[in-house]
Amino acid sequence: MRIVAFASTQQKELNMNQYQNILLAVDFSDHGQAVAQKAQSLAEQFNAQLHIIHVLDNIPMPDTPYGTVISLDEDSSDDLLETEKNKFIRMSDQLGIAAQRRWLIWGEPQQEIIRLAAQERIDLIVAGSHGRHGLAVLMGSTASGILYHAQCDVLAVHL
């Protein structure tokens, strides 16, 4: 595992003691646990609140507009959605993340991660990087999009 950190362009110097809210963006890839452990370690190191987001973009939800927060308390008739919810809840529980800092959202990952980071005043986004094309070869398309558009620092954990 290799770690690549990017400071936001608005921040003149990187002062990691200022991190109070860290957002872990998960996609449940094979190496996602390594990204989660890094985010948890940073949250502990800086005594920061750890938030978690998983953006559903692979499940057909024709009557659901992008940006809709999926309830973790309601059962769904869609088996794939229930599987994703259960993985998300299990990881959130393992990391000890409080319910009010858990975000399961239907939409486009880059857009929803950036929107939530601004909404929740996130200081650092931690995401895995495992893309295959263009700049994404280095970072992953979602991670590279977050890097260029987020208003906070981004930590890309190379998988």
Where are these predicted regions, by residue range?
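Gly/Ser-rich helix-loop-strand patches that form or flank binding pockets
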Residues: 1-8, 115-159
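Structural beta-alpha unit
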Residues: 3-17, 92-125
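Small/aliphatic-rich secondary-structure junction motif
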Residues: 14-70
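Active-site phosphate/pyrophosphate- and oxyanion-stabilizing loops and adjacent acidic/basic residues
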Residues: 40, 89, 144
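General small-molecule cofactor/ligand-binding pocket signal
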Residues: 53, 101-105, 155
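Generic structural signal for helix capping and beta-alpha/helix-loop junctions
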Residues: 60, 109-112, 134
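A short acidic, glycine-rich active-site loop
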Residues: 70-84
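Short beta->alpha linker loops
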Residues: 83, 104-108, 130
